[in-house]
């Protein structure tokens, strides 16, 4: 039993939420610069799971995002197991295909995206790891003396 219900899977629900978010609306609401930046962070964060899913399937995420946005409001998306290229992708009814996500999982993903955006906006500085330069490994040594026949 899934207590909170289900939504279209394949990260289409998150992409649909992102697609419905309009910077114009928040600007009209006279939001502060920080609020607009936070809004854009959340919007981008909501697109990322779909992008990763498509990239992991070896497909072009840029093309499929545009196609998915056109059909996501109708509960349609793509079964990545059945498409071989973004050009040939045909939208399917996600619920009929059995591609679903529990609402709780989607809700928590949205809450986490908002939490990260809030943390970034309220932090004076962010600390990250500096990528280490890896020195080339030593080449293999020569054969010791007396080993030639």
Which ranges hold each PLM region?
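Extended, low-charge hydrophobic alpha-helical regions
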Residues: 1-149
């Amino acid at each position: 039993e899934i207590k909170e219900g289900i939504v279209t899977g394949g990260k289409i629900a998150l992409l649909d939420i992102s697609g419905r978010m309009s910077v114009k609306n928040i600007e009209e609401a006279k939001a502060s610069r920080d609020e607009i930046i936070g809004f854009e962070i959340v919007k981008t964060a909501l697109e990322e799971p779909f992008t990763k899913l498509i990239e992991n399937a070896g497909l072009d995420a840029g093309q499929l995002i545009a196609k998915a946005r056109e059909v996501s409001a109708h509960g349609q998306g793509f079964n990545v197991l059945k498409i071989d290229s973004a050009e040939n992708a045909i939208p399917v009814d996600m619920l009929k295909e059995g591609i679903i996500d529990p609402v709780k999982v989607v809700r928590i993903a949205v809450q986490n995206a908002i939490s990260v955006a809030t943390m970034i906006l309220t932090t004076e500085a962010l600390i990250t790891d500096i990528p280490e330069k890896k020195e080339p490994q030593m080449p293999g040594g020569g054969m010791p003396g007396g080993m030639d026949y």
